[in-house]
């Protein structure tokens, strides 16, 4: 059982409080103003992206989009990047055209989208929804000129069009589907000031029955992950999205990063170590669905997959900066990947840009900004000894 502090319901949420706090924005601004160093290099990665331009040409909105079958998928993916990256450009530079572009995209999609669909709809909503919500959070809480009525319409869109697809996670699937859902549900909860939804996501993160909860994503204390046997790009997708949820939780005073002896870090270290060419321990594992792993229907998942070994997605900077710089916890293999890939870019699946948004020049151990309050994620179970309460 781990312990995590959270504010009481009456205290509300910190805003902006998803991937970026006011302190984070100030740190980015200062790093860019210096004109050199890692943050500046990360900013150049943002600037050169076509999705960061104030004259980005919106491809949507649409009434429905989804995956498998792909329906207007490119429109949603590209406009999600356009909204988030223009919102980030605005927050850092203060240039109004970027704010106006992000607002244009957010308002257009909020006014038209009715459904996220498809067999892979959980992934669709979880991956792109996270970018849309982060864009909305930045714009709403940085004096960008977005009216409260417009923000409320966006709230309704997140609740009515995006959330239903991810509401029940994906018990039947590999873990990356659920971590996609987890990060976006948590982000929607904060943006909409929905304490009940936030609490539900915290409970699922540590007690959920599917492959995307922390103990079922990182399945052994060694750091071996549920999708280690599938492909290295899939395992990176799963743990990378999990840190999206962990960062949102941290901003709100909940330390999922540290849960169960830094289990999320162990997953990243194991994956990074294997990716850079070193040996890691392996044990057979059957996943929560009974389909993937030793003894399952897809029982060819019986060894570490070499697929995509040595290819790294833009996921390592955020957890490395948290553990090594915020908390002073060693993360040597993640650090080697970060040095190899810096400055971190972005992708359609991953929000990325971690060198810009999370780099810290030195160790400065910190705690969540929120003052500790009541326990979060409370679960009651009946045992032979009586009722047992656990929380995070």
Language model features: what each stretch is:
Residues 365-392:
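Pro/Thr/Ser/Gly-rich low-complexity, intrinsically disordered linker/stalk tracts
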Residues 7-171, 206, 226, 248-251, ...:
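Extracellular glycan-targeting catalytic surfaces
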Residues 164-173, 213-231:
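Active-site-adjacent structural elements in folded domains
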Residues 124, 177, 231-238, 263:
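Secondary-structure capping and boundary motifs in well-ordered enzyme cores
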Residues 91-94, 189-193:
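Hydrophobic/aromatic side-chain positions at a characteristic register within alpha-helices
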Residues 155-181, 188, 194-195, 204-212:
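Extended amphipathic alpha-helical interaction segments
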Residues 1-5:
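Bacterial N-terminal signal peptides
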């Amino acid at each position: 059982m781990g312990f995590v502090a959270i504010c009481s319901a009456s205290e509300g949420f910190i805003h902006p409080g998803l991937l970026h706090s006011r302190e984070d924005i100030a740190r980015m601004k200062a790093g860019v103003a210096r004109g050199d160093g890692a943050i500046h290099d990360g900013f150049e990665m943002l600037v050169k992206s076509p999705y960061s331009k104030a004259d980005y040409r919106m491809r949507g909105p649409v009434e429905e989009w989804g995956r498998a079958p792909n329906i207007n998928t490119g429109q949603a993916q590209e406009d999600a990047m356009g909204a988030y990256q223009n919102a980030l450009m605005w927050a850092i530079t203060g240039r109004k055209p970027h704010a106006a572009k992000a607002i244009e995209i957010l308002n257009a999609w909020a006014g038209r989208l009715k459904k996220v669909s498809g067999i892979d709809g959980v992934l669709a909503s979880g991956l792109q929804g996270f970018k849309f919500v982060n864009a909305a959070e930045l714009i709403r809480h940085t004096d960008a000129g977005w009216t409260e009525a417009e923000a409320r319409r966006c709230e309704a869109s997140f609740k009515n069009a995006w959330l239903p697809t991810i509401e029940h996670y994906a018990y039947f699937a590999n873990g990356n589907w659920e971590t996609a859902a987890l990060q976006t549900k948590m982000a929607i909860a904060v943006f909409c000031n929905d304490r009940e939804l936030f609490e539900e996501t915290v409970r699922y993160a540590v007690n959920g029955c599917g492959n995307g909860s922390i103990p079922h994503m990182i399945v052994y204390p060694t750091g071996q992950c549920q999708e280690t046997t599938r492909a290295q790009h899939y395992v990176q997708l799963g743990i990378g999205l999990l840190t999206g949820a962990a960062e949102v939780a941290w901003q709100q005073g909940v330390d999922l990063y540290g849960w169960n002896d830094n289990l999320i870090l162990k997953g990243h270290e194991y994956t990074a170590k294997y990716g850079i060419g070193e040996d890691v321990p392996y044990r057979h594992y059957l996943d929560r669905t009974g389909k993937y792993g030793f003894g399952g229907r897809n029982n060819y998942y019986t060894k570490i997959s070499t697929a995509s070994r040595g290819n790294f997605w833009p996921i390592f900077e955020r957890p490395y900066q948290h553990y090594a710089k915020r908390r002073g916890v060693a993360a040597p293999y993640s650090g080697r990947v970060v040095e190899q890939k810096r400055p971190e870019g972005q992708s359609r699946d991953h929000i990325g840009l971690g060198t810009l948004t999370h780099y810290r020049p030195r160790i400065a151990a910190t705690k969540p900004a929120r003052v500790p309050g009541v326990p979060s994620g409370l679960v009651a179970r009946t045992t032979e000894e009586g009722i047992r309460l656990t929380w995070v």
